[in-house]
Structures are given as structure tokens and as C-alpha cells.
Amino acid sequence: MTRTVTRNQDKLFIPPGGIDFSSQTNKPGVVDIYLRAGDNTPGTGLHWHETHTEYLQVVQGYALVTIGNRTAVFSKDDGIITVPRYTIHQYMRADKTDEGKAGKDVDLVAREWTEPGDGDKEVFFRNMISLIMDKKDGALGTVGMLLSVMTVCWSHDNYPVFWKGPEVFGEAVQQRVRRAVTFSLMGCLVLFGRLVGCKPQYPEYTP
């Protein structure tokens, strides 16, 4: 398929939001994520990283942030949020909370970076947003994008939570079950994706 060349663009946006790669030109690997104002703007979804510690800072608006078993509303006054490796996390707009409803009419802007700062986050986001932009219509287009997205996630340390696991057996067992479920389901999707030509990253999207 013909892919849009986006590798040199400083910003990539789709209707729900997008990424600004140029806000911190003196700090490579730092990205600003925009979640547009609106009732139907999705969040990041629960996921975890295994080779990167992630740092998150709200620049504008209010974010409802989940880290492990704790969820709270954060604003720019709350400083830097640290997400340790293997810790499930997500964030979204906080419009439906008492603390966050004041920001319901403004875009949520969250700044992200990682340790190590190896540039992998930018490669991940560039490929993810570009795949969504290039998605073909119809069921085949949706399936193709899903397989491509899973392949990119697998190769760039982003693991979605398909099931949080049983809490009754304790956190250690819960984490093992969660990883097993994600690796099994995601691994099958990635294997099939690679068989049909999906790649970890695309030269049209990657600087």
C-alpha cells in the first residue's frame, strides 16, 4: 500500500488529538500529547512498559491518571509523575471529575519522556499516528491497522492490558497472569501481522 510520508513532520494530528514532537527542541525524545476537548476523546488505555521508565507531566488541562491500583486527577501544578517499569498505567481527560471539570473546554496536553531516552517513544508515536492516518476504509482496513498497531507496540515496549488478572491471589500472581494473557494474545496477532507484511516501523513514518 502507498503510505503517507510523515517522517519529517513536527506535528501529527487526527481528530481526537495528536503529538507535537517539536515543543522541546533542546530535549530529544520529549513529546507533547494532545487529547482534544470533547466527550468522545479516548484515553491511552491501560498498558505497561518493560524496558523504559516513563515520565509524565500535565502541561495544560486536567488528566485522570491511573498508575497501578491508584487513580487521581493531575494538573500542571502537580509536577512530574513517574511510571516504573512493569506498572500498568493510563491517562485520559478528567472532565467528569469534580477536580477536572474546570478544564472540559480546553485540550489536555501531557508531556512524556522516558529513561533511557533512546528516542523509541518518538518512533512509536510517529508510526502509531501515521498508521491511523493511513487506515483504509472497511473491515479489512480495520483488521490491517490492528495487526500493524500490535506489531509496532510489540517492538517498541508498549504492552496493552487485555485482562488485569485475578486480584485474589496477590499482585505478583496477578502480574504474571496479566503478562501471560497479553503476550499470548498479542503474540498471535503480531505473528499473523508479520506473516502478512506488517513491520515494527516504516521508513515513510520514521526519521
For each feature predicted by the language model, list its residue ranges.
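Double-stranded beta-helix
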Residues: 96-179
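A short, N-terminal "cap"/entry segment at the start of jelly-roll beta-barrel domains
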Residues: 1-37
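Residue-level recognition of conserved beta-strand positions in structured domain cores
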Residues: 35, 67-69, 93, 112
